[in-house]
């Protein structure tokens, strides 16, 4: 499809239970792939006074290199908010978004996700902040680009309405379309009628598509996605499973990378020679440690 020079491309957002992907319509692959998780800390009293009433209407601030938008120049009452950070006034949370938001260790940092165990969005405020972060990664302005947002085949009606509210009232996009990702997968293979097997992080689904429409009564799902495989692997590494000859060794515990201060080489079959960060052992939250253990 040939495009005119003055034509504005649509932004495609594909939020999954593990990764949220963003890119431009017509391209073969996404431009941005960010984790569907975010870190959060309680807002300080100063942050509550400055940003406690902004909520969904918060404007994106400058980058870490100091670039400032015209909105920030005109508004001298509040300091700009760095990209990758947002504030949830309703729950008094300071969110840390993107790879750096969930990778950098901070004292007391919790890890959360807007999705439930079935991959359905439950927290649209957090999804709005993540969507803003994806637009920033694409160097795109939501008010100037149409948005195509994907949804699972069994997305409830209430979630569809919330998604439209997020697009028009939260992001202020000029045009919006909510597309079934199962139908998009079938169309990408040139088949309007297909049986799509979707293996995701939270579950595995077998979904029939006929002439571009999903047969909802024929959907079969199992909660045995990639996360379940990772949990089973973690259990197998830390628990004895009858015949030790199967694995040959048993791990006492899995130590995440953020707890390792330094390492030394050791011979095969010998215990690891690592120095841990003792100061982080008791100030790390269970959610942060589990997230990095499963990576």
Per-region residue spans from a language model:
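C-terminal region/appendage detector
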Residues: 3-197, 203-295
């Amino acid at each position: 499809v040939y495009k005119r020079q003055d034509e504005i491309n649509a932004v495609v957002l594909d939020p999954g239970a593990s990764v949220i992907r963003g890119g431009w319509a017509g391209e073969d692959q996404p431009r941005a792939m960010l984790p569907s998780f975010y870190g959060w800390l309680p807002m300080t009293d100063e942050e509550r006074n400055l940003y406690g009433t902004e909520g969904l209407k918060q404007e994106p601030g400058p980058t870490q290199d100091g670039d400032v938008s015209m909105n920030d120049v005109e508004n001298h009452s509040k300091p700009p908010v760095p990209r990758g950070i947002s504030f949830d006034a309703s729950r008094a949370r300071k969110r840390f978004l993107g790879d750096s938001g969930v990778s950098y260790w901070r004292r007391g940092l919790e890890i959360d996700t807007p999705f439930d165990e079935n991959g359905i969005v439950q927290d649209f405020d957090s999804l709005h902040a993540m969507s803003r972060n994806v637009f920033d990664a694409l160097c795109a302005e939501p008010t100037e680009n149409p948005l195509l947002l994907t949804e699972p085949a069994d997305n409830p009606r209430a979630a569809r309405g919330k998604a439209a509210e997020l697009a028009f009232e939260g992001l202020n996009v000029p045009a919006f379309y909510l597309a079934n990702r199962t139908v998009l997968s079938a169309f990408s293979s040139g088949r309007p009628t297909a049986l799509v097997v979707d293996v995701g992080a939270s579950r595995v689904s077998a979904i029939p598509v006929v002439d571009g429409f999903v047969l909802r009564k024929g959907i079969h799902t199992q909660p045995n996605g990639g996360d379940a495989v990772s949990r089973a692997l973690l259990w197998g590494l830390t628990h004895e499973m009858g015949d030790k000859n199967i694995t040959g060794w048993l791990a006492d515990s899995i130590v995440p990378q953020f707890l390792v201060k330094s390492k030394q080489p050791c011979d095969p079959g010998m215990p690891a020679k690592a120095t841990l960060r003792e100061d982080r052992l008791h100030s790390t939250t269970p959610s942060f440690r589990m997230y990095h253990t499963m990576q």
